[in-house]
Amino acid sequence: MKSLYFVAGLFVMLVQGSWQRSLQNTEEKSSSFPAPQTDPLGDPDQINEDKRHSQGTFTSDYSKYLDSRRAQDFVQWLMNTKRNKNNIAKRHDEFERHAEGTFTSDVSSYLEGQAAKEFIAWLVKGRGRRDFPEEVNIVEELRRRHADGSFSDEMNTVLDSLATRDFINWLLQTKITDRK
């Protein structure tokens, strides 16, 4: 905000300087053509006095405007700090979020919920049966991948469940005498 005021001040100074040059040029041109003494505009002292008065008025008005603007900014700052009492150092609380941790946490909780639902559905559907889920569920488990990189851990779990299923199926299908 201060840089905006600074740029505005520079702009005003440039405009004021260009006005002074143009007035000086017109004074020089008007002095080459003498005007009658009864004309008050032809008097160079009168022009300089009017010019100084207008410059002073403009500068005074602009200074008053800047002072009122600073006062408004200060009051706004005080109101903001009063609202945030303990969080004065935190400027943009609504934008603060640790995206990676939140995303990983959300995905983990979602996958845990899905796994719990699948397990309950399997228990309800598979009571009394001794076989394991169909091949489709195992293929889905192989394709599923966790966001935080625990793919290898899940792969080991799936492979262990496949090996256990094959072993139990082998135990159930073979006769006791064939096992020795």
Swiss-Prot record:
Give start-end of the signal peptide: 1-20
Q: Where is the composition biased (Polar residues)?
A: 25-35
Q: Kindly provide the PTM information from the record.
A: Proglucagon is post-translationally processed in a tissue-specific manner in pancreatic A cells and intestinal L cells. In pancreatic A cells, the major bioactive hormone is glucagon cleaved by PCSK2/PC2. In the intestinal L cells PCSK1/PC1 liberates GLP-1, GLP-2, glicentin and oxyntomodulin. GLP-1 is further N-terminally truncated by post-translational processing in the intestinal L cells resulting in GLP-1(7-37) GLP-1-(7-36)amide. The C-terminal amidation is neither important for the metabolism of GLP-1 nor for its effects on the endocrine pancreas.
- Record's InterPro entries? Glucagon, Glucagon_GIP_secretin_VIP
Q: Which residues form a coiled coil?
A: none
Q: Disordered: where is this region?
A: 25-59
Q: Identify the tissues in which this protein is expressed.
A: Glucagon is secreted in the A cells of the islets of Langerhans. GLP-1, GLP-2, oxyntomodulin and glicentin are secreted from enteroendocrine cells throughout the gastrointestinal tract.
Name of a matching Pfam family: Hormone_2
Query: Is Signal one of the keywords?
Result: yes
Record-linked PROSITE patterns: GLUCAGON (PS00260)
Pro-piece positions: 84-89, 131-145
Q: Which UniProt keywords apply?
A: Amidation, Cleavage on pair of basic residues, Hormone, Phosphoprotein, Secreted, Signal
Residues recorded as bearing Phosphoserine in the entry: 54, 105, 108, 150, 152
Which compartments is it annotated to reside in? Secreted
This entry carries the following GO cellular component terms, namely:
cytoplasm; extracellular space; plasma membrane
Residues bearing PTM Arginine amide: 127
Site feature: Cleavage: 52-53, 83-84, 91-92, 97-98, 130-131, 145-146
The family classification in the record reads: Belongs to the glucagon family.
Name of the protein in its database record = Pro-glucagon
Q: Which organism is it from?
A: Bos taurus
**Gene transcribed to yield this protein:** GCG
